[in-house]
Amino acid sequence: MHISVILFCALWSAVSAENSDDYELMYVNLDNEIDNGLHPTEDPTPCDCSRENSEWDKLFTMLENSQMREGMLLQATDVMLRGELQKLQAELGRLEGSLQKLCGPEAPSETRLARALDDLLQASRDAGRRLARLEDAGALRPQEEAGRALGAVLEELRRTRADLRAVQGWAASRWLPAGCETAILFPMRSKKIFASVHPVTPMKLETFSACIWVKATEVLNKTVLFSYGTKRNPYEIQLYLSYRSIMLVVGGEENRLVADAVISLGTWTHLCSTWDSKKGHMALWVNGDSVATAVDMATGHVVPEGGILQIGQEKNGCCVGGGFDETLAFSGRLTGFNIWEGVLSNEEIREAGGAESCHIRGNVVGWGVTEIQPHGGAQYVY
């Protein structure tokens, strides 16, 4: 009888535990004796749910809180930026409306216009400052690092550019025209500084072409590039500069051709001059372009031989080394000086100032072939 009651109670407890939400483990001690035929009943011990969280639980809780704070911060920043941008749009809208009013058919008076422009200027400055603050607030650290790196690169480029300009200036001061390996340097204006030319072919000419490369440092009212003269007439042939103009004289000052505003100081310029006695045709060329022509210039004249040909000075005396005028002297550099008997064609003149200019030589005076002697402080440079 006791055993039947015990089995019935155990079965009833198992069924009750299966149908409940919380499973409780019941321990039945079948070895105990039950007095008076009654099954002892005891209340189950309640679960202690207030246990302390583990370290992993604390870590996950901290991560969740951090993500929540970051999300709230981003949301607040987005709201602030959106509000500021809306304000800026409103400001720009007011500016646009003000500009439309200023440009409308009914323009205000000068005072009102000035006041409105001042207001617009101040508003644009305020908007610019606010936009700058927004950009600073929204800038990320990688962008700041990239900006600093870009600034460093720009600074390096500025220094490189300055160095390049210095090198270019140094090279320009020593640069010679294409095909030319030497030039004659006239360091200053002096009656003792010139170069004498000694052609083998006599200078008895009824027609000629003369070309020369010029880089002048200073030009006065008359600065002689080259001159040929005799004791009887020191002005048989002259090519000289007058400030920014170039002049060709044959047989005397009455036969003079002028080309105005064609010379630039400090730069190489290729000059050519031609003359034909038969028709008195005279022409001047600058860098391959015809700049001046004339007819009836020393028509029928013949340039006599036996004179003195010089570069950088005018010979108006009887003897070498005398009769020079300091104010007529050339200062700068000259190269590629050639004289031909005959008139060159347009194409030949362009070739004379081209890539092989110093390798094209005249049949009366040829640069690099005819003897040219520097005097005073004049000297060859390379």
Curated annotation (Swiss-Prot):
GO terms for biological process: innate immune response; negative regulation by host of viral process. It comes from the Eukaryota. PROSITE patterns: PTX_1, PTX_2. Transmembrane segments: none annotated. GO terms for molecular function: complement component C1q complex binding. Pfam families: Pentaxin (PF00354). Residues 79-137 form a coiled coil. Residues 180-382 form the Pentraxin (PTX) domain. GO terms for cellular component: extracellular space. Keywords: Coiled coil, Disulfide bond, Glycoprotein, Secreted, Signal. It is found in: Secreted. Glycans are attached at residue 221. Plays a role in the regulation of innate resistance to pathogens, inflammatory reactions, possibly clearance of self-components and female fertility. Homooctamer; disulfide-linked. Binds to C1q. This is Pentraxin-related protein PTX3.
